[in-house]
């Protein structure tokens, strides 16, 4: 009997109820709760005894990656904002149920001191580090440039771009040959929305920084690749990432006619972390429901 499923209906296809949470949002309080593979992702030992740091690992795409890494046999450290402790504790429980070590490292990635120390704390707690999945990001929709403040513009770049620089600069000397860095850009790097000027600009910066870094560290045996999600149902969207009028139809403009779920990105983060992608570096992997990159 075939286990094939229709991808257009495999996950939630209805309208999303309007809902607003303070930034950064708590996934457990969303309706519907995003699917991060808690009940569905099955590992096969592809990352046995690897050591992973996942930023934004409490919810959304980062949570899905962290769960998948643990089920593939890796020990996992996650970073998150202190207000996201509820979601983070849930991820910790799931990782430990896999028989793997879970390390919680709360803090603000826009703080250079914290971001730089995060790498060393994860390395120490895990007894090494060979996977970095950099997922955490800031997205706040502002329809009119007149309302976009310098404070928000700077904060978005600090979390999305400067933290990427701080984290990777600290990590490169610590990473062994065979290590993998996975950054998170967006379809917004290619098709910027008018209400996401600062966010889209950071995602283009991530793309080029990652490609350049990949070429620089290739001779060290370290790979760097980029995941570019399309519209994915996460706490980012309901905590200011979209205006409320866009929530009900979120993702329905794609050829798949629905938003993606974080669980649908987890296999990409696993593949790029694994030895199966040994000849893959400086590449962008879109997960956009049929929307094209470029």
Curated annotation (Swiss-Prot):
Substrate binds at residue 186. It comes from the Bacteria. InterPro entries: NAD(P)-bd_dom_sf (IPR036291), Sc_DH/Rdtase_CS (IPR020904), SDR_fam (IPR002347). Keywords: Acetylation, Oxidoreductase. NADP(+) binds at residues 53-77. SUPFAM superfamilies: NAD(P)-binding Rossmann-fold domains. Pfam families: adh_short_C2. CDD domains: SDR_c1. Its EC number is 1.-.-.-. Belongs to the short-chain dehydrogenases/reductases (SDR) family. The active site is at 199 (proton acceptor). The modification N6-acetyllysine is found at residue 39. Residues 1-32 are annotated as: Disordered. GO terms for molecular function: alcohol dehydrogenase (NADP+) activity; oxidoreductase activity, acting on the CH-OH group of donors, NAD or NADP as acceptor. This is Uncharacterized oxidoreductase YghA.
